[in-house]
C-alpha cells in the first residue's frame, strides 16, 4: 500500500485539486507543505488532532512541514457560518500565537519543523498595494460562491471577514514563493481558501504546480462537533482542560466511532488497527480499541507519565470502594487530575454542584439530586438541603463529589 493509499484508507483525504499529481508527489518525492493554525484562542483543541496526525504521518514519510501560526489572520477571523467573529486585540492575537506555537513544538518534539507567523509579511502590506497588487485578482462572484460566505449573505457579512480568503491566499503565495512550499493542508472547511491560494499562485507566478489537500471534519455519531463534551470545548492545554477529561472522552467513544478515530487520530499501523477492530467485534466489553486510542492520544499531547496518572485516577474513581478505603495519596493524585474547588466554610450541596461545574444552575443541581445521580464518595445523597461540612471530609480536607458514572470533582477545605 502506497503512502497516498494509506492516507485514503485512514479517511484523511477529502479533497485535492489534482489527485494524480498529489499521489505522485506524496508517494515518490519529498514535498514541503504547510498547515495553518489561527490563534483565535489560547490553546488548540482535540478537533485539531486530525491536522496534527496528518503532519506527523507526512513527516514520517519524509515530507517537510511548515507550521503557519496566523498572527495576522487571527486578527481578522475566518468567517463563521452563523455569526460575526469577535475581533481579537493585537496583543491577544500575538500572545495566543506564541502559546499555540509552543504547544505544537511540545507535541512535535524532536521533529524537524519550520514555524512561521503571517503577521511578519501581511502586516507589511499597505492598503493601496493590497488592492492593486492582489485584490484585482479576486473575482467577487467567485468569492460569493464560497460555502460560508453564501450562508452568511442573508444575515450579513462584514468586508473584514469577507477579506479573510484573500489573506489566506496570500499566505500560500508567500510560502510558495519564499519557502518553496508546494502543498497546503487544511480542514475541509478551508477548501475554498485553499483553492483561492492555488488560483493566486497561478495568476501571479504563472505556474500551476501548487497543490492543495483537505481533511474531513470529524463529527460525533450524533452530528455534534468533534471535541465537545457536554457543550465544553476540550482544550489541549492541561490548564484549560485536565488530561483526565480528555482521557475519559476518548475512553467512552462508541464502538461505531472508535475504529475511524484510530485511523484518523493515531499513528498505529494498519495491521494493528485491523487487529483492534477484530477484537472489538469479538469482545466489545473489553474496550481494547478505546484503550489503545486513549493511550495513543494522551501520550501524544501530554506524556506517558500523565497517561499513567489518568489510568490510576480511573481506577480510583471506578473502584466503588467504601469511603474508609481511600488513601491520602489517592487525593493527592486527584488534585492533579480532576477539577478541584477550594472552600473555606460549609456549603450547600446544591451550591457545590454549581461551583464545581457538575451542574450549570441550582435548579439543574436539584434535579440531579432528585434523580439520585449525586454521590459523596460512593454514597448517594438524596436530600436537597444537604450541607457539606468538614465532618464529611477524609483526612480533614477532601470531598469527592460524583455526578452519574463519568463526572467527578474534588472539593478541598
From Swiss-Prot:
Keyword terms, alphabetized: Aminoacyl-tRNA synthetase, ATP-binding, Cytoplasm, Ligase, Nucleotide-binding, Protein biosynthesis, RNA-binding
A Pfam family this chain is assigned to: tRNA-synt_1b
Binding site for L-tyrosine: 34, 164, 168
InterPro entries in the record: aa-tRNA-synth_Ic, Rossmann-like_a/b/a_fold, S4_RNA-bd_sf, SYY-like_C, Tyr-tRNA-ligase, Tyr-tRNA-ligase_bac-type, Tyr-tRNA-ligase_bac_1
Catalyses which reaction(s): tRNA(Tyr) + L-tyrosine + ATP = L-tyrosyl-tRNA(Tyr) + AMP + diphosphate + H(+)
Class of the enzyme per the UniProt entry, highest EC level: ligase
Record Gene3D superfamilies: HUPs, RNA-binding S4 domain, Tyrosyl-Transfer RNA Synthetase
UniProt motif 'HIGH' region: location: 39-48
EC number: 6.1.1.1
Primary subcellular site in the record, as a coarse category: cytoplasm
PROSITE patterns tied to this protein: S4
S4 RNA-binding domain: residues covered: 347-413
Subcellular location: Cytoplasm
HAMAP family, A to Z: Tyr_tRNA_synth_type1
Function per UniProt: Catalyzes the attachment of tyrosine to tRNA(Tyr) in a two-step reaction: tyrosine is first activated by ATP to form Tyr-AMP and then transferred to the acceptor end of tRNA(Tyr).
Protein family membership: Belongs to the class-I aminoacyl-tRNA synthetase family. TyrS type 1 subfamily.
Assembly, per entry: Homodimer.
Name of this protein: Tyrosine--tRNA ligase
UniProt source species: Aster yellows witches'-broom phytoplasma (strain AYWB)
Gene this protein is translated from: tyrS
Amino acid at each position: 500500500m502506497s503512502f497516498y493509499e494509506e492516507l485514503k484508507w485512514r479517511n484523511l483525504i477529502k479533497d485535492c485539486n489534482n489527485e494524480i499529481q498529489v499521489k505522485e508527489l506524496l508517494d515518490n518525492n519529498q514535498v514541503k507543505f504547510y498547515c495553518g493554525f489561527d490563534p483565535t484562542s489560547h490553546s488548540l483543541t482535540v478537533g485539531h488532532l486530525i491536522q496534527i496526525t496528518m503532519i506527523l504521518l507526512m513527516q514520517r514519510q519524509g515530507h517537510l512541514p511548515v507550521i503557519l501560526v496566523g498572527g495576522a489572520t487571527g486578527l481578522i477571523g475566518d468567517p463563521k457560518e452563523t455569526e460575526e467573529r469577535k475581533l481579537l486585540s493585537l496583543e491577544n492575537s500575538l500572545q495566543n500565537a506564541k502559546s499555540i506555537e509552543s504547544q505544537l513544538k511540545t507535541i512535535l518534539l524532536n521533529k524537524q519543523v519550520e514555524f512561521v507567523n503571517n503577521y511578519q509579511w501581511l502586516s507589511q502590506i499597505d492598503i493601496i498595494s493590497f488592492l492593486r497588487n492582489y485584490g484585482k485578482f479576486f473575482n467577487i462572484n467567485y468569492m460569493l460562491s464560497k460555502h460560508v460566505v453564501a450562508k452568511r449573505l442573508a444575515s450579513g457579512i462584514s468586508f473584514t471577514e469577507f477579506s479573510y480568503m484573500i489573506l489566506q491566499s496570500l499566505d500560500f503565495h508567500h510560502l510558495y514563493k519564499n519557502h518553496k512550499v508546494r502543498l497546503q493542508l487544511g480542514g475541509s472547511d478551508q477548501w475554498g481558501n485553499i483553492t483561492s491560494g492555488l488560483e493566486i499562485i497561478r495568476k501571479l507566478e504563472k505556474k500551476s504546480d501548487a497543490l492543495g489537500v483537505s481533511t474531513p471534519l470529524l463529527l460525533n455519531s450524533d452530528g455534534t462537533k468533534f471535541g465537545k463534551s457536554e457543550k465544553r470545548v476540550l482544550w489541549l492545554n492541561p490548564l484549560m482542560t485536565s488530561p483526565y477529561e480528555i482521557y475519559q472522552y476518548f475512553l467512552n467513544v462508541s464502538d461505531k466511532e472508535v475504529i475511524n478515530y484510530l485511523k484518523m487520530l493515531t499513528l498505529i499501523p494498519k495491521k494493528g488497527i485491523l487487529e483492534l477492530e477484530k477484537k472489538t467485534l469479538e469482545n466489545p466489553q473489553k474496550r481494547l480499541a478505546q484503550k489503545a486510542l486513549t493511550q495513543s492520544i494522551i501520550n501524544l499531547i501530554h506524556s506517558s507519565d500523565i497517561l499513567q496518572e489518568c489510568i490510576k485516577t480511573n481506577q480510583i474513581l471506578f473502584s466503588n470502594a467504601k469511603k474508609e478505603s481511600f488513601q491520602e495519596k489517592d487525593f493527592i493524585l486527584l488534585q492533579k487530575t480532576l477539577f478541584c474547588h477550594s472552600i473555606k466554610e460549609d456549603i450547600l450541596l446544591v451550591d457545590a454542584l454549581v461551583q464545581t461545574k457538575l451542574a450549570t444552575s441550582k435548579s439543574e443541581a436539584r434535579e440531579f439530586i432528585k434523580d439520585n445521580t449525586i454521590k459523596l464518595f460512593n454514597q448517594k445523597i438524596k436530600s436537597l438541603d444537604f450541607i457539606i461540612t468538614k465532618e464529611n471530609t477524609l483526612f480533614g480536607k477532601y470531598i469527592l463529589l460524583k455526578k452519574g458514572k463519568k463526572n467527578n470533582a474534588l472539593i478541598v477545605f
